[in-house]
């Protein structure tokens, strides 16, 4: 599991965070100062990368939050059997199996054996983002 920690105040829309052990993309961040002596708070709304669930988090701006390190690489489709796609990593030629539910909708129609795809590895899980 490759992650790092950053302050909540450094997050921007479009960045990625880990909420409840699930990697999420930040879709909205709202910062507000609570009062004269209170510290600023941030309300983060994020959508799960793998499950699409909306998650909300409210933390102080100076709190540390876990951010996943996303590794992007190219792979070649070896076979498509039912709901599992078998890929070959073009860096070290290892075989990877990715469930069909972890494929972006716009990439599903263009998947075929021999096609090269861009794969994201987030927290030891794989997602096919696009067909090259």
Curated annotation (Swiss-Prot):
GO cellular component terms, semicolon-separated: cytoplasm
UniProt record, GO biological process: positive regulation of translational elongation; positive regulation of translational termination
Keyword entries, A-Z: Cytoplasm, Hypusine, Initiation factor, Protein biosynthesis
Entry protein name: Translation initiation factor 5A
Gene symbol of the encoding locus: eIF5A
Matching NCBIfam families: eIF_5A, PRK03999.1
PTM-bearing positions, type Hypusine: 36
Coarse class of the protein's main subcellular location: cytoplasm
Keyword Signal among record annotations: no
GO molecular function, one term: ribosome binding
Localization terms from the record: Cytoplasm
Family statement drawn from the similarity comment of this UniProt entry: Belongs to the eIF-5A family.
Physiological role: Functions by promoting the formation of the first peptide bond.
InterPro entries the record matches: IF5A-like, IF5A-like_N, NA-bd_OB-fold, Rib_uL2_dom2, Trans_elong_IF5A_hypusine_site, Transl_elong_IF5A_arc, Transl_elong_IF5A_C, Translation_prot_SH3-like_sf
């Amino acid at each position: 599991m490759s992650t790092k920690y950053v302050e909540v105040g450094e997050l921007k829309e479009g960045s990625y965070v880990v909420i409840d052990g699930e990697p999420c993309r930040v879709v909205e961040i709202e910062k507000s100062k609570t009062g004269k002596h209170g510290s600023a708070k941030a309300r983060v709304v994020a959508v799960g990368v793998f499950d699409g669930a909306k998650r909300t988090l409210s933390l102080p701006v100076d709190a540390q939050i876990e951010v996943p390190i996303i590794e992007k690489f190219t792979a070649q489709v070896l076979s498509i059997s039912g709901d599992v796609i078998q890929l070959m990593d073009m860096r070290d030629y290892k075989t990877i199996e990715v469930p069909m539910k972890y494929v972006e909708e716009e990439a599903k129609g263009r998947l075929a054996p021999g096609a090269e795809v861009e794969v994201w590895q987030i927290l030891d899980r794989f997602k096919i983002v696009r067909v090259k």
